[in-house]
Regions:
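Active-site neighborhoods of divalent-metal-dependent phosphate/nucleic-acid chemistry enzymes
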Residues: 33, 46-52, 73-120
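Nucleotide phosphate-binding site architecture
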Residues: 9-10, 42-45, 128, 136
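Short, flexible helix/strand-to-coil boundary loops that buttress conserved ligand/catalytic motifs
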Residues: 13-16, 48, 95, 131, ...
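Residues at the C-termini of beta-strands that transition into short coil/loop
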Residues: 38-39, 84, 123, 139
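Alpha-helix capping/helix-boundary segments
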Residues: 8, 40, 87, 108, ...
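Short, structured coil segments at secondary-structure junctions
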Residues: 30, 76, 130-131
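Acidic, PIN/NYN-like endoribonuclease modules and their adjacent C-terminal/linker elements
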Residues: 1, 109, 113-140
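Short, well-structured N-terminal submotif of metal-dependent ribonuclease cores
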Residues: 1-39, 50-69
Length: 140
């Protein structure tokens, strides 16, 4: 299993070149299932909801809701891995290690560890602090 973290998923969603081209070239030949996780859904949802809350004009709100809707449609087309008891146990183990990594990234790492999955991320600096986590950047 290959999990796209939120940053890599955003590159896919936006078709951000050249990172998108590098990533897709590797994913196209990968044998493992490619998934996203519910934590990425939460992160993107929170971001769009905050943007909607800050929108002042109808045009801004219309555009923001359209992006929120597009995000929802995108997640509906992808396999999404949840945050279950195994992921929570990994998350709690990492908290005890006092790793200096953001909470959401720790949750994503917990899911990847619990699934014995390869995590694709541009944030190698933080994720490489997690013992046992397999993480690579396929966008370069």
């Amino acid at each position: 299993m290959i999990i796209l973290d939120t940053g890599v998923l955003s590159i896919v969603q936006r078709g951000e070149r050249p990172a998108y081209d590098h990533l897709v070239a590797r994913l196209d030949v990968a044998d493992d299932e490619v998934v996203v996780c519910v934590v990425s859904f939460e992160e993107q949802m929170r971001g769009w909801l905050a943007y909607i809350a800050r929108s002042k004009s109808s045009n801004q709100q219309i555009a923001a809701y359209a992006r929120l809707h597009a995000m929802l449609d995108d997640f509906a087309t992808r396999p999404v891995v949840g945050f279950d008891r195994s992921a929570a146990a990994e998350f709690e183990r990492m908290l005890r290690l006092k790793l200096r990594i953001g909470t959401m990234d720790l949750r994503i790492a917990g899911i990847a560890l619990a699934q014995d999955a390869l995590l694709l991320s541009k944030n190698l600096t933080d994720f490489r602090k997690v013992p046992g986590l397999r993480v690579e950047d396929w966008t370069v």
